[in-house]
Amino acid sequence: MPGLSTGFNSSIVNTPFSYNTITDFLISQPLTIDVEIDDQYSGCFSVKGIELEATVLYAGISDFARLSVELSPAEMLIYLNMFLVWMRESSQIERVCVIEKFLDNALILLFSKRFGSEDPFLDALQVARWMGDHDAMKFCPDIGIASGTVMAGFTGTPKEYSTSVYGRPLILAAGCARLNPRGDVASMITFPADEWRTRSLDDVFQPIELDHPEKGKKKQAQTWVIGDPREVDFPGMGRLALRDIANLIHSMPSISAETKSREWVQLIRSKGFYKKND
């Protein structure tokens, strides 16, 4: 039941190979690179990483700049957490992805055969579809997907190390998310056109079966359509052909996440949990 508490409980996406995080993957698998470098200009540092083929799903917060201006800092903090919790729910439907990182305005999911996926691109599409079909609070994330070679590794200094993933697919997925035309559609997924190959939309996004009280199981009509390839100027990569899959049916949320975040801050203040310590 929704409510307010001062405790915190977290959960992690589980995969068939128990790689809940990139760190889990790196410490449990043979490294592609494991060396110490003594550079005459920057000094000594270690390089540890694994190269792999993967599909990146980038889901960015729509209107992040506007929200940051119109919401108070506390409201924005709550909005971001609501978005991330909702996103983690979507990633739970596919147990073959790893949450690469939470950014200030986006979440990156990583799919790979190394994590148990038979078709990483298809699995990423299924998670993206879930977002579009279950956007009850009108997050409308900007979604981009791209595949290719990435390097997962440790970065940092002797005081603190973190893990991350690097490579062209991350930039391409983020760019696809920002370059989708959206228009008057409920949600849109954008990706390089050549990744679609000869797939059929009806095979990829199969009809959802609903339980009708009188007619029993009934298949829902297809609400997604795929557009023709379109060329765009992609910074640093030249002309690229992209494709979009759009959900044409708008849901009717009873309340938006933007409104809900304001309500939560009001409740926090009314309960005396908002304490400024200047």
Where are these regions (language model features)?
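Substrate-engagement module of ASCE P-loop NTPases
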Residues: R88-E89, W130-H134, G175-R178
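Intrinsically disordered, glycine/charged-rich C-terminal tails and inter-domain linkers
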Residues: M1-S42, P181-D278
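Amphipathic alpha-helical transducer elements in NTP-driven molecular machines
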Residues: L125, G167-A173
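Short amphipathic alpha-helices in soluble, non-transmembrane regions
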Residues: D123-M131
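Catalytic core of nucleotidyl cyclases, primarily class III adenylyl/guanylyl cyclases
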Residues: S91-D119, D135-R168
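Alpha-helix/helix-capping structural signal
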Residues: S62, T149-V150, D194
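Catalytic NTP-binding/metal-coordinating core of nucleotidyl cyclase/transferase enzymes
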Residues: V35, D39-D123
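Conserved, well-folded catalytic cores of nucleic-acid-processing
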Residues: P158, L172, L179-G183
